[in-house]
Amino acid sequence: MKLLEDRIKKDGQVIGTDVLKVDNFLNHQVDPDLMADLGHEFYRRFSNEPITKILTVESSGIAPAIATAMEFHKPLVFARKHKSLTLKDHLYTATVYSFTKKTSNEIAISRKFLSADDNVLIIDDFLANGQAVEGLMDIIAQAGATLSGVGIVIEKTFQKGRKLLDEKHVRVESLARINAFENGQVIFAPED
């Protein structure tokens, strides 16, 4: 998606050889107009699927996921990383490792928000090693729901996440695919 690639070139910051900082439009400060465009593009790519729920992990996946949910006119459910007094019983849970934070978290979704009747579209901000998506897939399986696909805002093709999902025959649609970071610059994969 050229609009997103242009925004990454303009405002993204490469850190080392494997981290892209996009905190001024995606995962700290959020550009609502860009999120609307991302949601529209995910809808365009997945509108042929019988989606009943949009699923993501808090917190950086929420903005593009809510924009997508608005396009589909379907509920967004986000997995919580921290249990609270209101989220402690009757849960689906999975453990996920955060590539950026280098920590593991148990994510949880209340059983009342996901059932075997659901067709789920996962939306997330990044695909690196695929841990967040795998955790959400585990929760979908626990609920007996159907995974309709995965929408990723930014995919790092040089990490193992896509390969992991391809091996499981999961449909993945990424709006920006990055092949490498070289000399502080983002090298994008050619669009299909």
From Swiss-Prot:
Oligomer and partners: Homodimer.
Residues given in the record as xanthine binding sites: 20, 27, 156
Residue numbers binding 5-phospho-alpha-D-ribose 1-diphosphate: 128-132
Signal peptide: none
Family as reported in the entry's similarity comment: Belongs to the purine/pyrimidine phosphoribosyltransferase family. Xpt subfamily.
Reactions listed under catalytic activity: XMP + diphosphate = xanthine + 5-phospho-alpha-D-ribose 1-diphosphate
GO term, biological process aspect, one: XMP salvage
Keywords associated with the record: Cytoplasm, Glycosyltransferase, Purine salvage, Transferase
SUPFAM superfamilies cross-referenced by the UniProt entry: PRTase-like
Name used for this protein in its record: Xanthine phosphoribosyltransferase
InterPro entries in the cross-refs: PRibTrfase_dom, PRTase-like, Pur/Pyrimidine_PRTase, Xanthine_PRibTrfase
Main subcellular location: cytoplasm
Pfam families (UniProt xref): Pribosyltran
Taxonomy, superkingdom: Bacteria
Record EC number: 2.4.2.22
GO molecular function: xanthine phosphoribosyltransferase activity
Keyword Glycosyltransferase (UniProt): yes
Protein function: Converts the preformed base xanthine, a product of nucleic acid breakdown, to xanthosine 5'-monophosphate (XMP), so it can be reused for RNA or DNA synthesis.
Pathway(s) annotated for this protein in UniProt: Purine metabolism; XMP biosynthesis via salvage pathway; XMP from xanthine: step 1/1
